[in-house]
Curated annotation (Swiss-Prot):
Catalyzes the N-acylation of UDP-3-O-acylglucosamine using 3-hydroxyacyl-ACP as the acyl donor. Is involved in the biosynthesis of lipid A, a phosphorylated glycolipid that anchors the lipopolysaccharide to the outer membrane of the cell. One of its GO terms (molecular function) is N-acyltransferase activity. This is UDP-3-O-acylglucosamine N-acyltransferase. Its EC number is 2.3.1.191. The active site is at H253 (proton acceptor). One of its GO terms (cellular component) is membrane. Pfam families: Hexapep, LpxD. It comes from Rickettsia africae (strain ESF-5). InterPro entries: Hexapep, Hexapep_transf_CS, LpxD, Trimer_LpxA-like_sf, UDP_GlcNAc_AcTrfase_non-rep.
Amino acid sequence: MVSSNFYKNLGPRKLTAIIDFLHDIIAPPKIHEDIAIHDIKILQEASPNDISFLSNPKYSEFLKTTKAAACIVPKNFTGEANPNTVLLHAQNPYFAYGKLIDFFYTPIKSYPAKIMKSAIVADSATIGKNCYIGHNVVIEDDVIIGDNSIIEAGSFIGRGVNIGRNARIEQHVSINYAIIGDDVVILAGAKIGQDGFGFSTEKGVHHKIFHIGIVKIGNNVEIGANTTIDRGSLQDTIIKDLCRIDNLVQIGHGVKIGKGSIIVAQTGIAGSSTIGKYCTLGGQVGIAGHLNIGDGAQVAAQGGVAQNIEAGKIVGGSPAIPIMDWHRQSIIMKQLLKTSNSKLKK
């Protein structure tokens, strides 16, 4: 059940209007124009007034028993379904679901074009049109914030930082030494632009190296809660356009992440490594320093990468090896343990 404390339901919507809104839907030739859809629900919970979706074949069985008025299914779906449920075929049901959420819901919380009285904004800072600056925000000298941006309560924007248009910076984010593009979302607690972990050791003493690089973040990037992105020592830390970075990710100094890459929670990338375009790093992946991960490469969850990965390769395990080799090793290890246990029992 979606809580009305936080989200406003814009329904009901006519099913015919939903089909028009989604554009790329293949629907039955005749649909009654009076069918009204009140909400979006998972198959198991949907009522005759709801629409649902099927993007994972694991849930196909629920399509037989669902009470949903309509369901978005894959384009090539030919399985069984409740005869009372209208099937809407889509190339990407999950993408269609994402669009439907925007069609049905809007947050209750709004952000007026306003600087709250408790915010501290330097006289030399430039705040764009229609911006919201929340309670106890600190914006230092020479900061530039683009039009239509939101800076939520308790965030800190350090001297000289440049943030583009349509940014959404959630609560208690700190940003220093950074240039950030348009349409960027930074979730609560993220820390951007602090010193990297750089020391030189002389006679048993670890001497801190002053970092003179910055962080550059492209357009349409999302950075998760409590993620940390260090600025470079000499070279900049760079996050290219369209990247999606999950919560609790550590990105070291001088790291470069290519366009459209996805990095899942609790991953750590050591300094000066380069991640190519449209790469995927699963949860808890570790990337050693000064490595190159080629375009389109994928690392399975908990993979430990200690050497370069060629473009398009899929690896897993620690140390990471080609994914099929990792699967074979796992099977062999299981068999060896089984044999060993049998011998011990004898």
